[in-house]
């Protein structure tokens, strides 16, 4: 069995502040003890420089720990007249290592199709960023027993454009749309079932990638349900929304992941 290091990625969405970043690093510096889990902070782009400075300032205190910086979106274009967009190279220059791709809110609110998601996946990797690719089904799709069909379609578009080996440098996040921001989480058994499907789907085209890729669960993860979720054999951590805005609770999730 592959040894996959758990990851806890905090997606602040359009929330947070420089003060929140300071609070998080104050706790990280005293409470994070080792590198058994990887912690990723994905603040709004305006705070990337603040987070990078805090990473530098706390480098000695965090020695032996894995705290990285990510972002919530990337343009599929390298440069040009795209007002408000940020390219992969710009994000790489800012110190980002990871980028969330295809979050359900981007797909739903901003019309990001699976083709656009696949292009953004490619743009991220082109500039040395690791995509955190989000996939997931809606409530009606689950009720219609179409969960696997929807997720397979979302994965296949990315595979068709980028090739299976592109997943050698990628993370997948399963985020059931009916659980995102609702306070209603998938049960550990439901999460495991879908994660196992994703892993099997990728294993069919590359056993190595299927075995080694990290698959996060995202959807109302809290300190009270994280241990059971993270204990599932195919759940490799979480993509965290609301709880990532509370320094104490987010640190609790990191600690749980370290012992998963």
UniProtKB/Swiss-Prot annotation:
UniProt-annotated binding residues for substrate: 11-13, 181, 220, 241-242
InterPro entries noted in UniProt: Aldolase_TIM (IPR013785), TIM_sf (IPR035990), TrioseP_Isoase_bac/euk (IPR022896), Triosephosphate_isomerase (IPR000652), Triosephosphate_isomerase_AS (IPR020861)
Domain of life assignment: Bacteria
Documented EC number(s): 5.3.1.1
Localization terms from the record: Cytoplasm
Recorded metabolic or biological pathway in which this protein acts: Carbohydrate biosynthesis; gluconeogenesis; Carbohydrate degradation; glycolysis; D-glyceraldehyde 3-phosphate from glycerone phosphate: step 1/1
UniProt record, GO biological process: gluconeogenesis; glyceraldehyde-3-phosphate biosynthetic process; glycerol catabolic process; glycolytic process
Keywords on record: Cytoplasm, Gluconeogenesis, Glycolysis, Isomerase
Matching Pfam families: TIM
Catalytic activity: D-glyceraldehyde 3-phosphate = dihydroxyacetone phosphate
Any GO molecular function: triose-phosphate isomerase activity
Coiled-coil stretches noted in the UniProt entry, renumbered to this chain: none
Predominant localisation class: cytoplasm
Active site per the UniProt annotation: 103, 175
GO cellular component, one term: cytosol
Recorded family membership: Belongs to the triosephosphate isomerase family.
Cited HAMAP family: TIM_B
Quaternary structure (record): Homodimer.
Biological function: Involved in the gluconeogenesis. Catalyzes stereospecifically the conversion of dihydroxyacetone phosphate (DHAP) to D-glyceraldehyde-3-phosphate (G3P).
Protein name: Triosephosphate isomerase
Organism: Shewanella piezotolerans (strain WP3 / JCM 13877)
Gene that specifies this protein: tpiA
